[in-house]
Curated annotation (Swiss-Prot):
It comes from the Eukaryota. Signal peptide: none annotated. Disulfide bonds join C15-C21. InterPro entries: Nigrocin. Belongs to the frog skin active peptide (FSAP) family. Brevinin subfamily. Expressed by the skin glands. It is found in: Secreted. GO terms for biological process: defense response to Gram-negative bacterium; defense response to Gram-positive bacterium. It comes from Odorrana hosii. Pfam families: Antimicrobial22. GO terms for cellular component: extracellular region. This is Nigrocin-2HSa. Keywords: Amphibian defense peptide, Antibiotic, Antimicrobial, Disulfide bond, Secreted. Has antibacterial activity against the Gram-positive bacterium S.aureus ATCC 25923 (MIC=56 uM) and the Gram-negative bacterium E.coli ATCC 25726 (MIC=28 uM).
């Protein structure tokens, strides 16, 4: 759903910003 898509995008952004991926 939309909420799941937003959550997934948020995780990608957090991963990129943290430099852990």
């Amino acid at each position: 759903g939309l909420l799941g898509s937003l959550f997934g995008a948020g995780k990608k952004v957090a991963c990129a910003l943290s430099g852990l991926c």
